[in-house]
UniProtKB/Swiss-Prot annotation:
Family recorded in the similarity comment: Belongs to the queuine tRNA-ribosyltransferase family.
Pfam families named in the record: TGT
Alphabetical keyword list: Glycosyltransferase, Metal-binding, Queuosine biosynthesis, Transferase, tRNA processing, Zinc
Co-factor binding details: Binds 1 zinc ion per subunit.
Keyword Methyltransferase: no
Keyword Glycosyltransferase in annotation: yes
Binding, substrate: D92, S93, G94, G95, F96, D146, Q189, G216
Organism of provenance: Rickettsia felis (strain ATCC VR-1525 / URRWXCal2) (Rickettsia azadi)
Pathway noted in the entry: tRNA modification; tRNA-queuosine biosynthesis
Enzyme active site: D92 (proton acceptor), D266 (nucleophile)
Protein name from the UniProt record: Queuine tRNA-ribosyltransferase
InterPro entries associated with the record: ArchSynthase1/Queuine_TRR, TGT, TGT-like_sf, tRNA_ribo_trans-like
Superkingdom of source: Bacteria
Binding site for Zn(2+): C304, C306, C309, H335
Length: 361
């Protein structure tokens, strides 16, 4: 079994192109991870997701612990077998969903107690339990349990939250079962305060995680402020380990973040937008519901090799989406995921060539 490793093959200014080696295969970086929240990327077969060029996808601890439960997935052979995906899987810690979806949640030093958004049952999620769940799922990359600092937050609020995340990171690291080819990433917090981001990074680097994530961004602060944080935050982290920007997926944000040293991304934007009838193209976004496409016999993009573009017109996609046919959601999602993987491929090529990303997203 391969050991977990990150090799940077090319670098252009702060942008890096490399390969992460794991027990479940290699991840070309910079990488975009489609989100498979409940063990599936919505409207896609797992093999179709692989055909778009994805090397890794993301699963969600919170949702899988509620249904069908981590213990059941473990009994059935683990998440890879359960969902028929043999490439790497990264699971988030569940912390963000607990904070955003659950009512009557209570944060203490021990963890977060909350009621299920499905049936109201009460649960307790701690750093140890989150890490155990991800181990039961068989996650290739496990995330440390953290508190995603809300925005806006005062300096003192952000400091208190960051310090809790640091203590939880210690407990997550102690609970992690180290195995060849598997990894655990720590998450730095600190909101928009450079001093706090630096302290968070310093504390987590001491724990020697296999990789690091920057959390607490894309929560309402806007692109300008996010880029300001990214101008310094990746520099606080080890340059020989992957750097993951959580929950960021707009093409322009990805390009700007790669320029600042980010290696990994995840976001629901391509899948959610696809189901809602919005396609990403190199000419800009297309709202296929618009009546102007009812008689448009051209594909979304002429040089795109996805099934939606190779086989169907905008007029047909317009019809499917307008009448709510499942095929419409499937084809639009397939196209968007292909677009995002093509974007990452182009970025990797430009880094390899030592060129600035002067193409439109």
């Amino acid at each position: 079994m391969s050991k977990f490793s990150f090799n940077i093959h090319h670098q252009h200014k702060k942008a890096r192109n490399g390969v992460i080696t794991t027990a479940h295969g290699e991840i070309r970086t910079p990488a975009f991870m489609p989100v498979g929240t409940r063990g599936t990327v919505k409207a896609m077969l797992p093999e179709s997701v692989a055909e778009t060029g994805a090397d890794i996808l993301l699963g969600n601890t919170y949702h899988l612990m509620l249904q069908p439960t981590a213990e059941r997935i473990a009994r059935l052979g683990g998440l890879h077998k359960f969902m028929n995906w043999d490439k790497p899987i990264l699971t988030d810690s569940g912390g963000f969903q607990v904070m955003s979806l659950s009512k009557l949640r209570k944060i203490t030093e021990e963890g977060v107690s909350f009621s299920s958004h499905i049936n109201g049952d009460k649960y307790m999620l701690t750093p140890e339990r989150s890490t155990e769940i991800q181990h039961l799922l068989g996650s290739t990359i496990t995330m440390a349990f953290d508190e995603c600092t809300p925005y806006p937050a005062t300096f003192e609020e952000a400091k208190t939250s960051m310090q809790l995340t640091t203590r939880w990171a210690n407990r997550s690291r102690n609970a992690f079962v180290k195995r060849d080819g598997y990894a655990q990433f720590g998450i730095i917090q600190g909101s928009v305060y450079e001093e706090l981001r630096e302290q968070s990074a310093r504390d987590l680097v001491e724990l020697d995680f296999e990789g690091y994530a920057i959390g607490g961004l894309a929560v309402g602060e806007g692109q300008e402020l996010m880029f300001k944080v990214l101008d310094y935050a990746p520099d606080f982290l080890p340059q020989n380990k992957p750097c993951y920007l959580m929950g960021v997926g707009k093409p322009a944000d990805i390009i700007g973040a790669v320029r600042r040293g980010i290696d990994m991304f995840d976001c629901v934007i391509p899948t959610r937008s696809g189901r809602n009838g919005q396609a990403f193209t190199k000419y800009g976004t297309v709202n296929i519901r618009n009546s102007k496409y009812a008689d448009d016999n051209e594909p979304l993009e002429h040089d795109c090799l996805c099934p939606a573009c190779k086989n169907y017109s905008k007029a047909y996609l317009h019809l499917l989406v307008r009448i709510g046919e499942i095929l419409g959601a499937m084809l639009m999602t397939w196209h968007n995921l292909t677009y995002f993987q093509n974007l990452m491929s182009r970025i990797r090529k430009y880094i390899k060539l030592g060129k600035d990303f002067d193409f439109d997203s």
